Amino acid sequence: MQNKIANQSNIRRSNPVATLKKNAMLIILVLVYIFFTIMTKGRMFKPTSFASLINQNAYVYILGCGMLMCMLTGGNIDLSCGAFVCLLGALGGMMMVIWKWGTALSLVAMLAIGVVYGCGLGALIAYVMVPPWIATLAGYLAFRGLGTSILGVSSTNSISFKDSPDFLSIFSGTLFKTPEGQMNMPCMIVGVVAAALVVLLVFKNRATRLRKGYEVDALEMDAAKSVLGAAVILLVMYKLAMAGGIPTVLVWVAVVVLLYAFITSKTTIGRHFYVVGGNIEAARLSGVNTKRIMFLAYLNMAFLTSIAAMTTISRYTAANADAGKNFEMDASSACVVGGVSASGGAGSVLGMVIGATLIGVINLGMFQINLDANYQRVVKGFVLLAAVVFDILSKKQQKL
């Protein structure tokens, strides 16, 4: 009886205003999607648009996980990741196409280069105490120049991967491929299993928190979250089933997102990132190795950039000098729009995913209504500014 009373006291009462603020970006995402669906006369809701959204924005989700870890340490970002994608793409093209190293060895080499760069960058920032924006700006300038120079050996300033079908199938292929417009049952089965897992995890997490005496949301709120999450998964998988199957890049994105969601929420090292970003001096005094956390943030970012480079050049079917352009802006925008604090110490992988999806929907929607590229940049700039202002105002209200 006492346990039951204790559990009831740990249940938060539903506050409509607080709930609205907490889910503001999710609500905006839905409204923006509806807006562009109307403006494009339904094209945004077609199965091919769902597939395009995933394929074209895979790099944002992957880099966003890395940028999240950097921003958690105190609002730091990596300005070099886009240029590093260009350099890695050029080197990957040389290894796979020019030097004939084969797909497996070339991919391992690209990952190794990413790790080496990450160690060097992390050491400069964490131990030599070079400011992150200076260290990564140097990389931004150097890598773009190196990548363009390497690609200059080709008469077309690009290296095609059309003769590397194994590589293309790994990152830009389709699982359970069927003709477009035909129901893909394996795809739907995956969707049903994933939706069921979401519902199971929501209530398992609720039971665990109650057992440990932590606060939880009202039962109807958790039920609503699980139903909404399951519905979104089923809708996306249905659209992909009608579009021809599951893009292989979605598997890579799912693995990265789920892994980093686990790291940031369930591990000690993940919690240390939040502690360092919240108050670095307090973190140091409490025994957290702050230099190690900063080192790991940039090592991790470089490693994920290697994976993003693979998905990018595979989608382009070529390595070219434009690969990675403005990727650092897209990744940091996804984090900020998704609620990651610009000053560090707060944010989540789920929020980043919502932010990345919102940026992707805006990009795809503006493309489908043929909005001029310059105006597209203006819109994205205002979206980013609005997200930062929202973050600042929310923090001020919390202090009152």
Locations of the language-model features?
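Alpha-helical transmembrane segments within multi-pass membrane transporters and channels
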Residues: 100-141, 354
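Cytosolic-side transmembrane-helix boundaries in multi-pass membrane proteins
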Residues: 1-34, 197-227, 289-292, 366-400
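Inter-helical junctions in multi-pass inner-membrane proteins, predominant
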Residues: 42-52, 152, 237-250, 261-265, ...
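Transmembrane alpha-helical segments in multi-pass inner-membrane proteins
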Residues: 298-311, 315-378
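Transmembrane helix-bundle core of multi-pass membrane transporters
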Residues: 143-264, 399
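Single transmembrane alpha-helix segments in multi-pass membrane proteins
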Residues: 33-38, 43-99, 123-133, 282, ...
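Membrane-helix/interface signature in polytopic inner-membrane proteins
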Residues: 202-216, 258-298
